[in-house]
UniProtKB/Swiss-Prot annotation:
Residues 420-583 are annotated as: IIB. This is Lethal factor. Residues 40-66 have a biased composition (Basic and acidic residues). Its main location: secreted. Induction: Positively transcriptionally regulated by AtxA, which, in turn, is induced by bicarbonate and high temperatures (37 degrees Celsius). The gene is lef. Changing residue 181 to A: Loss of ability to bind to PA.
Length: 809
């Protein structure tokens, strides 16, 4: 029997009296204050005597239930409706008042929220990140609908969300009310009851009774096509394997039972389902709620205590040395002035007294301040005459540093770095042996890391891993400096920029942690600069250790699959929620290797290189790993689209002939193998965003980040390719000498004349000026191309001459 909606309406209205009598609070047996069934004559005097008392108790009970409902709704229902829309808001609220308070209490217990909003529900923050597939929905009748035209949606997840459009229609339009209850039924079956043990055991008899009925009315009302077509009786195993189908039936039955003018339809066509809902009483819901609380460890204290208990023996067995090591991991050790001064030779001390630190272009502000403090301490040993002499020397800050002074400050720069294990692991991608730090300190890092690895021997275990989520708040810039400044809305810092967020999310598929993650057992409020809120599910074999104050330290070198990225709102401020699951790092490494193989095959073909040439390398080890890989495609396409193909092929072949690479990485550039042969400028390159290494003929690009004057990583890559053009042009001029063309007298003279006419970074030296001019000449912005021709015409002509020379060689 194919039940039409119109028919349901007629039946519903014809049974309106019945419906009204059945529309009291559901699942909760109410005391009937006046009269009842049975032998009235025998008890009429007693009942009349107690009538007032029963009525009073009844009113008190209903009042208690109403207060309980209001208290729950205060916690889970958020009204986001303008003042003039109050009538629409109230209509939606009245729908929720018909839902049993115990159902809403279970929803509250799992962290669920209900939002009543104006207009298009897809514009709500919780639904903005939905995929296009999930925006195609079906209503309770199986009719297709587009979410932006619909009025209610239940979003599943660890903390489910129900979004309801405010509308007066719910008062008269019972179908709209029915669909709201249908979505609530989905939450009840999918997000709550499915989490308890044997959730469908009692529902099995209901389904089989409907299936074996003499007519198909109950199936037509509630069953999905798959359930209708199932040839035999349903078993528990079948229901467990087809839980979505069962949840659909439950949600429909719930909706028909709750909506007053449709309740009689359920009783008429599927009486077994009606009786099931009718008996789904307060006691059963309470049992479900208790089981749910126990299984999900909803109490924050209980969750904390269980983890502490799991790691109690581990904590008790820690030696003082082990505790000190974990403290060292959490709190970087700042350098001590006295230790640094003591390590200096007398000659170095004399040099430090006279160096004009402000004129150093490779020291950070913090480093300059620290070195000035060293100078002050050393000056105490000067005579008054020497101090006066030193003051006169330092008045003129325009004097450049001598080469000797530069080399000394480069050495000293390493000595003033904090001893920070996690930062070191992040900078190197866990490759501790890279030579970007002096040997003694490197050995200390290796010892400490090996000892911490040994401490973290206990896994989280199968009893805990699937029941807990761990949390980490993160500064956006620690993940992506490119988008970090733009992700927060510039007009309202409580909001996230939607356009930038979509770009941020698009390439975020997997992650790697090469250092030790320190995570919170329970989510904590974010600091001002923490706008990323990670929620991480562990694997049972994740090794961890318990720290004080509700934190765990996780092993290094783990993989993370990104399950969802969405904007959430907490305390009137928007954050980005990243849901991730711990997986073996090897699984993520395989994804990266497959992507590297694919991109090399594509570009080898495009550039006419041998099939198995390994031109492109992904040296990726950190938390925004997938973005490095995905962005490489965009960077290379923009490079190809903005530079002459003949020039690209000629220069790329030159690089390949020298075993050169295009290295896309998220670790600092001095730690890249292709850079090891080029260590004389290692100190300046710690924070470099890009680098061309003539010795290895390789372009290194650090991301996700951008330089001071670069709009994106593509411009950085074109700048570095400009250095490769400089190198190849010099090689063609004299293959024996193989010097940069920018070292020619002709270009040195051009630099003296035009070197200050383009960008501040271009003023650094001849090579950087050439690369900056090359970048501007191949910009997607026509105005920047003209800028070189107008402001540096000789440079423009010189570079064009080199391009023609290379192409025709």
């Amino acid at each position: 029997m194919n039940i039409k909606k119109e028919f349901i309406k007629v039946i519903s209205m014809s049974c309106l009296v019945t419906a009204i009598t059945l529309s009291g609070p559901v699942f909760i047996p109410l005391v009937q204050g006046a009269g009842g069934h049975g032998d009235v004559g025998m008890h009429v005097k007693e009942k009349e005597k107690n009538k007032d008392e029963n009525k009073r108790k009844d009113e008190e009970r209903n009042k208690t239930q109403e207060e309980h409902l209001k208290e729950i709704m205060k916690h889970i229902v958020k009204i986001e409706v303008k003042g003039e829309e109050a009538v629409k808001k109230e209509a939606a609220e009245k729908l929720l008042e018909k839902v049993p308070s115990d159902v809403l209490e279970m929803y509250k217990a799992i962290g669920g929220k209900i939002y009543i909003v104006d207009g298009d529900i897809t514009k709500h923050i919780s639904l903005e990140a939905l995929s296009e597939d999930k925006k195609k929905i079906k209503d309770i009748y199986g009719k297709d609908a587009l979410l932006h035209e619909h009025y209610v949606y239940a979003k599943e997840g660890y903390e489910p969300v129900l979004v309801i459009q405010s509308s007066e229609d719910y008062v008269e339009n019972t179908e709209k009310a029915l669909n709201v209850y249908y979505e609530i039924g989905k939450i009840l079956s999918r997000d709550i009851l499915s989490k308890i043990n044997q959730p469908y055991q009692k529902f099995l008899d209901v389904l089989n009774t409907i299936k074996n009925a003499s007519d198909s009315d109950g199936q037509d009302l509630l069953f999905t096509n798959q359930l209708k077509e199932h040839p035999t009786d349903f078993s528990v195993e079948f229901l467990e394997q087809n839980s979505n189908e069962v949840q659909e039936v439950f949600a429909k039955a719930f909706a028909y039972y709750i909506e007053p003018q449709h309740r009689d339809v359920l009783q008429l066509y599927a009486p077994e389902a009606f009786n099931y809902m009718d008996k789904f009483n307060e006691q059963e819901i309470n049992l479900s709620l208790e089981e749910l609380k126990d299984q999900r460890m909803l109490a924050r204290y209980e969750k904390w205590e269980k983890i502490k208990q799991h790691y109690q023996h581990w904590s008790d067995s820690l030696s003082e040395e082990g505790r000190g090591l974990l403290k060292k991991l959490q709190i970087p050790i700042e350098p001590k002035k006295d230790d640094i001064i003591h390590s200096l030779s007398q000659e170095e001390k004399e040099l430090l007294k006279r160096i004009q630190i402000d004129s150093s272009d490779f020291l950070s502000t913090e480093e300059k301040e620290f070195l000035k403090k060293l100078q002050i301490d050393i000056r105490d040993s000067l005579s008054e005459e020497e101090k006066e002499l030193l003051n006169r020397i330092q008045v003129d800050s325009s004097n450049p540093l001598s080469e000797k002074e530069k080399e000394f400050l480069k050495k000293l720069k390493l000595d003033i770095q904090p001893y920070d294990i996690n930062q070191r692991l992040q900078d190197t991608g866990g490759l501790i042996d890279s030579p970007s730090i002096n040997l003694d300190v490197r050995k200390q890092y290796k010892r400490d890391i090996q000892n911490i690895d040994a401490l973290l021997h206990q896994s989280i275990g199968s009893t805990l891993y699937n029941k807990i989520y761990l949390y980490e708040n993160m500064n956006i810039n620690n993940l992506t400096a490119t988008l970090g400044a733009d992700l927060v809305d510039s007009t309202d810092n409580t909001k996230i920029n939607r356009g930038i967020f979509n770009e941020f999310k698009k390439n975020f598929k997997y992650s790697i942690s090469s250092n030790y993650m320190i995570v919170d057992i329970n989510e904590r409020p974010a600091l001002d600069n923490e706008r990323l809120k990670w929620r991480i599910q562990l694997s049972p074999d994740t090794r961890a250790g318990y720290l004080e104050n509700g934190k765990l330290i996780l092993q290094r070198n783990i993989g993370l699959e990104i399950k969802d990225v969405q904007i959430i709102k907490q305390s009137e401020k928007e954050y980005i929620r990243i849901d991730a699951k711990v997986v073996p790092k090897s699984k993520i490494d395989t994804k990266i290797q497959e992507a590297q193989l694919n991109i090399n095959q594509e570009w080898n073909k495009a550039l006419g290189l041998p099939k198995y040439t390994k031109l492109i390398t992904f040296n990726v080890h950190n938390r925004y790993a997938s973005n490095i890989v995905e962005s490489a495609y965009l960077i290379l396409n923009e490079w190809k689209n903005n530079i002459q193909s003949d020039l690209i092929k000629k220069v790329t072949n030159y690089l390949v002939d020298g075993n050169g690479r295009f290295v896309f990485t998220d670790i600092t550039l001095p730690n890249i193998a292709e850079q090891y042969t080029h260590q004389d400028e290692i100190y300046e390159q710690v924070h470099s965003k890009g680098l061309y290494v003539p010795e290895s003929r390789s372009i290194l690009l650090h991301g996700p980040s951008k330089g001071v004057e670069l709009r994106n990583d593509s411009e950085g890559f074109i700048h570095e390719f400009g250095h490769a053009v400089d190198d190849y042009a010099g090689y063609l001029l004299d293959k024996n000498q193989s010097d940069l063309v920018t070292n020619s007298k002709k270009f040195i003279d051009i630099f003296k004349e035009e070197g200050s006419n383009l960008t501040s970074y271009g003023r650094t030296n001849e090579a950087e000026f050439f690369a900056e001019a090359f970048r501007l000449m191949h910009s997607t912005d026509h105005a920047e191309r003209l800028k070189v021709q107008k402001n540096a015409p000789k440079t423009f002509q010189f570079i064009n001459d080199q391009i023609k020379f290379i192409i025709n060689s």
